[in-house]
Swiss-Prot record:
Any Gene Ontology CC annotation: apoplast
Organism (species): Arabidopsis thaliana (Mouse-ear cress)
Function: Endogenous secreted peptide that acts as elicitor of immune response and positive regulator of defense response. Amplifies the immune response triggered by flg22, the active epitope of bacterial flagellin. Acts as a negative regulator of root growth.
Domain of life the protein comes from: Eukaryota
Name of the molecule in the record: PAMP-induced secreted peptide 1
Alphabetical keyword list: Apoplast, Hydroxylation, Plant defense, Secreted, Signal
Compartments, record wording: Secreted, Extracellular space, Apoplast
Induction per the UniProt record: Induced by infection with the bacterial pathogen Pseudomonas syringae pv tomato strain DC3000 and the fungal pathogen Fusarium oxysporum conglutinans strain 699. Induced by the flagellin flg22, chitin elicitor and salicylate.
Upper lineage: Eukaryota, Viridiplantae, Streptophyta, Embryophyta, Tracheophyta
Expression tissues: Expressed in guard cells, hydathodes, leaf trichomes, and vascular tissues of leaves and roots.
Record PANTHER family: PAMP-INDUCED SECRETED PEPTIDE 1
One GO-annotated biological process of the protein: innate immune response
Main location: secreted
Length: 72
């Protein structure tokens, strides 16, 4: 009978562990579940503030062609 090397055993153990973690431990529906709309509208205000912040970041970006020269 042939002897099995430790590296082969290690690879099989890692693959079985990954399969177990992927299919048994982790099956979550979503990473973050959004809550229902609350009566005070705080979630809507947060989304609007986030949108305005991202818009202001995009406005700060330089527009036009890239500068020519070394490193570009």
């Amino acid at each position: 009978m042939r002897r099995v090397s430790w590296s082969t055993v290690l690879i099989v153990v890692v693959m079985v562990s990954l399969f177990f973690v992927e299919h048994v431990v982790v099956p979550a529906a979503a990473g973050r579940v959004l809550t229902e709309k609350s009566g005070d509208g705080s979630a809507t205000m947060t989304v609007e503030k986030m949108k305005s912040t991202v818009d202001s970041w995009f406005q700060r970006l330089a527009s036009g062609p890239s500068p020519r020269g070394r490193g570009h």
